[in-house]
Amino acid sequence: MTTRIVVAQILGAHGVHGRVKLKSFTADETAVFGYAPLTDESGRREFKLRRTGTGKDHFLAEVDGITGKEAADALRGTRLYIERDRLPAPEDEDEFYHADLIGLDTVTADDQPFGTIKAIYDFGAGDMLEIRHVSEKTVFLPFTKACVPVIEIAAGRVVVEPPANFFAPAGPQPAEGEEMPDGALEALEGEEAGAGTAPQP
């Protein structure tokens, strides 16, 4: 049975004429426009794309058969797949496609579940893994050897080591028994909600 991997995701509509915003997960991000056929997760619906422009961290594209904003909006969140054997094999056994990581479970060094990899982004300072944490929060982890020391594609397992205080709220904490000043609790909650996360692209 051939393995299918996700190579792109439709982020939503762009404008009123049916164009979409597209996030590519391939190492050469433009290569996704040369792959065919692209299908949805079920494999039953095919998509033909034509690149029309570039946005911030995404491409703009036309999809065959999509001519209006409503139809384009209906595709929001759709992930596009390709048969794994249509991609050239990595030259080294330790190499892999970024797309191979999408959907893999992550665990900590002591084998505790951490979350599921949803996407890989480059925000300008290196690749980041978007992970749906077991707490149901979305977190972003630097895709470095220090933070991601073990990747086992065949086993579907990735070991992560988040930086120290990854989930700790920023700012000073009150001493035990000390009350927080007015407004500090709301500010702290806002900081905590953003700890270890980044805005959705």
From Swiss-Prot:
Residue intervals of the PRC barrel domain: 92-166
- List the SUPFAM superfamilies hit by this protein, alphabetically: PRC-barrel domain (SSF50346), Translation proteins (SSF50447)
Q: Name one GO molecular function term.
A: ribosome binding
Gene Ontology BP annotations? ribosomal small subunit biogenesis; rRNA processing
Task: Could you list this entry's UniProt keywords, alphabetically sorted.
Answer: Chaperone, Cytoplasm, Ribosome biogenesis, rRNA processing
Broad class of the protein's primary localization: cytoplasm
Q: Name one Pfam family in it.
A: RimM
What highest taxon heads this organism's lineage? Bacteria
Q: Which GO terms describe its cellular component?
A: cytoplasm; ribosome
> What InterPro entries has UniProt attached to this entry?
PRC_barrel-like_sf, PRC_RimM, RimM, RimM_N, RimM_N_sf, Transl_B-barrel_sf
Residues of the region (Disordered) are 169-201
* Localization (cell): Cytoplasm
Family stated for the protein in its record: Belongs to the RimM family.
Q: Any domain commentary? A: The PRC barrel domain binds ribosomal protein uS19.
Please explain the role this protein plays, according to its UniProt record.
Answer: An accessory protein needed during the final step in the assembly of 30S ribosomal subunit, possibly for assembly of the head region. Essential for efficient processing of 16S rRNA. May be needed both before and after RbfA during the maturation of 16S rRNA. It has affinity for free ribosomal 30S subunits but not for 70S ribosomes.
The subunit field of the Swiss-Prot or TrEMBL record says:
Binds ribosomal protein uS19.
Q: What is this protein called?
A: Ribosome maturation factor RimM
Q: Which organism is the protein's source? A: Rhodospirillum centenum (strain ATCC 51521 / SW)
Lineage of the organism? Bacteria, Pseudomonadati, Pseudomonadota, Alphaproteobacteria, Rhodospirillales
